Amino acid sequence: MPTIQQLVRKGREVLVEKSKSPALDSCPQRRGVCVRVYTTTPKKPNSAMRKVARVRLTNQKEVNSYIPGEGHNLQEHSIVLVRGGRVKDLPGVRYHIVRGTLDTAGVAGRTQRRSKYGAKRPKPGQAAPAKKK
């Protein structure tokens, strides 16, 4: 424990918080162009084919972004909106693509948590479409 005199001379060092999404440059979202759209496998013990896109942002930085939801319409040169948020079982993927904006379509047939997937509200009285396997 320092003495008061040591604190007068030196002071306390302020801890600097490191951003979890540095490529966004303190913006909530950024627009970008898909450079490559591909699938990758997660870390152990999980098993899947996760949909990922390499995106060049408007600030010229390139990031790996996760494409959430079932099915997507993205391909190379698609314009997307990128937000922060990592995917725990995909190393190096620290961003998410926002569904339902710009060239990214919302998830079709989504009835719950629709706002997170850019899905429109289904018409009242309309039967829910059969889920395909």
Curated annotation (Swiss-Prot):
With S4 and S5 plays an important role in translational accuracy. Interacts with and stabilizes bases of the 16S rRNA that are involved in tRNA selection in the A site and with the mRNA backbone. Located at the interface of the 30S and 50S subunits, it traverses the body of the 30S subunit contacting proteins on the other side and probably holding the rRNA structure together. The combined cluster of proteins S8, S12 and S17 appears to hold together the shoulder and platform of the 30S subunit. The modification 3-methylthioaspartic acid is found at residue 89. Residues 124-133 have a biased composition (Low complexity). Residues 103-133 are annotated as: Disordered. The gene is rpsL. InterPro entries: NA-bd_OB-fold, Ribosomal_uS12, Ribosomal_uS12_bac. Signal peptide: none annotated. PANTHER family: 30S RIBOSOMAL PROTEIN S12 FAMILY MEMBER. This is Small ribosomal subunit protein uS12. One of its GO terms (molecular function) is structural constituent of ribosome. Residues 111-123 have a biased composition (Basic residues). One of its GO terms (cellular component) is ribosome. Part of the 30S ribosomal subunit. Contacts proteins S8 and S17. May interact with IF1 in the 30S initiation complex. PROSITE patterns: RIBOSOMAL_S12. Keywords: Methylation, Ribonucleoprotein, Ribosomal protein, RNA-binding, rRNA-binding, tRNA-binding. Pfam families: Ribosom_S12_S23. CDD domains: Ribosomal_S12. GO terms for biological process: translation. It comes from the Bacteria. Belongs to the universal ribosomal protein uS12 family.
